Amino acid sequence: MLAGLKVKKQELANSSDVTLPDRPLSPPLTAPPTMKSAEFFEMLEKMQGIKLEEQRPGPQKNKDDYIPYPSIDEVVEKGGPYPLIILPQFGGYWIEDPENVGTPTSLGSSVYEEEEEDSLSPNTFGYKLECRGEARAYRRHFLGKDHLNFYCTGSSLGNLILSIKCEEAEGMEYLRIILRSKLKTVHERIPLAGLSKLPSVPQIAKAFCDDAVGLKFNPVLYPKASQMIVSYDEHDVNNTFKFGVIYQKARQTLEEELFGNNEESPAFKEFLDLLGDTITLQDFKGFRGGLDVTHGQTGVESVYTTFRDREIMFHVSTKLPFTDGDTQQLQRKRHIGNDIVAIIFQEENTPFVPDMIASNFLHAYIVVQADNPGTETPSYKVSVTAREDVPAFGPPLPSPPVFQKGAEFREFLLTKLTNAENACCKSDKFAKLEDRTRAALLDNLHDELHTHTQVMLGMGPEEDKFENGGHGGFLESFKRAIRVRSHSMETMVGSQRKLHGGNLPGSLSGGIVHNSMEVTKTTFSPPVAAATAKNQSRSPIKRRSGLFPRLHSGSEGQGDSRTRCDSASSTPKTPDGGHSSQEIKSETSSNPSSPEICPNKEKPFIKLKENGRANISRSSSSTSSFSSTAGEGEAMEECDSGSSQPSTTSPFKQEVFAYSPSPSSESPSLGAAATPIIMSRSPTDAKSRNSPRSNLKFRFDKLSHASSSAGH
């Protein structure tokens, strides 16, 4: 296939002697499908041919392979008058012919669209700036008006953004559409006459992109989407320009001679005054065009102007720094050589060749030659040249292309310069850069619109990933596994609660006590008077560090709300096989410490000390004391937080928080209120159920109940 493409390319090269006026016009933006397919295959063949030539070195191109144009030296030797521009020996450029009306210009090209008439100021001479119509179409026709936006993910053409709007003009209804893809942006207005119903969004996209498949559009549901879309559409709209200005003296035909000029003739100064204002670069606040405005390393002065809300900075060769001994004058060429369009000012009749200046960026030149300089009515001849892949641009040159000095010539020149740069951006080299930039920005816009739409719908990124079949890697898989395990545990806990009447075996819940038939709840309610008296002076209590650590610190005299749990003593073995238990108390009803339950509680406490036994609060049955200054609900919260601690923190016991829905028969002071209880399990309970200490604790509890009953 590559060989066939090579042969076809050679045939096209042999027939490349077609003159410039015979070049066909560019097809309209909405060309028939057959023409679109032909253009696509032609572009594909061209790209494959270029890749083949790049991969295969081949012999260098010689002069014998071409029909060369006469060199500039030969033209100069023949004598004048000389043309303003002559083509390079091996071509590659076109020259605008003002006498041939068939010369294509951007006025008849689909690449550009002129600005609307109302955008021109009343003082203009009819010269119109050209720009991409689709770049400003959304702001002009959609922004602030009723319309719909859609985005398409993963089509054969990549991501797509479509805007659609119904409008009426001259008694007819139209459908205005903007379709954005990585390749291009299409803006069209379709009449609805003869259509029974509106076409669907995929049908509209299919009409503009015949080879598109997998079209699945979603509506954009984000209030600020219009601003994001208009920013994307206008990302390549430029309101700042920089142009080079090169001074060419008589019979200068080399690049070194052009950049080596330092003197400015009166005619050249007069022309610079026509272009703009001479400004001082130091601390200049306007568009600087890459010039140094702080340290003065790019000269002292330059020429600057504003034109139709656009800023223009001119890189004048004679005002840029001159370096002695540097024949190439890189300080000057590094600015002018990086411009896209340049002006060549000729004071005398001398030809200019576009390849005279070696640059990868310069694509178009406007040559201005002074006619009758120094007179009261000077005039200027103008000629335009550009590379072959640059589309023609307006305004067209008049015939003859001669202008009198004045505002009209200035406006024509600035308009021509601006349109020239816009046209050069459509050349092959710049178009590739623009395509890559457009594709990256379109993908970013699509992702942002999709994300904001999902947020507006209440779908987070996690749900969105699950909906689209995505996954979040190892971390998301681990989270899902934990959620499944937690759900399984909750299911087991629920089934055991139904089976055992509300409580669970400790083997399932990691420390939950046995059912209520195996537990004896020991509760007490000391007299209110005694509790109030003891509230001011509390006995020192040593707190254990176990499953329920001390969460609050501070002096006991502070009045801030604290949540603690009052734990009762453990009970001996009962016929039901119950274990020791603790009960949550509220200080609003009582605030006792475990050793100070009743007036007679000090005696057994002293006896324990005399017998050399440890404090009850530190006994093996893990009888502990907590004081509470908040309500019962806060005590429950602290117990919940404590129960989340690992059960291995205390090697002597295992405690969990349990909620008793029915009042305990042994707790008359609480009435019908629900009793949250902290259950204590000790590994030594089985060994010490009949121990003297357990019997002593049992007698101590009976004494506490007797005192409580006497109080009532």
Swiss-Prot record:
PROSITE patterns: RAPGAP
Protein's UniProt keywords contain Phosphoprotein: yes
Disordered: annotated span: 1-33, 529-712
Broad class of the protein's primary localization: cytoplasm
GO biological-process terms attached to the record: negative regulation of neuron projection development; regulation of small GTPase mediated signal transduction
Compartments, record wording: Cytoplasm
Presence of the UniProt keyword Cytoplasm in the record: yes
Entry-linked Pfam families: Rap-GAP_dimer, Rap_GAP
Feature: compositional bias, Polar residues: 566-594, 641-652, 681-694
Keyword annotations: Cytoplasm, GTPase activation, Phosphoprotein
Rap-GAP domain ranges (all copies): 229-445
Phosphoserine: residues carrying this PTM: S26, S488, S495, S525, S539, S545, S593, S594
Compositional bias of kind Basic and acidic residues: 599-612
SUPFAM superfamilies in the record: Rap/Ran-GAP (SSF111347)
Phosphothreonine modified-residue sites: T30
Role description: GTPase activator for the nuclear Ras-related regulatory protein RAP-1A (KREV-1), converting it to the putatively inactive GDP-bound state.
Name of the protein described by the UniProt record: Rap1 GTPase-activating protein 2
Species name: Mus musculus (Mouse)
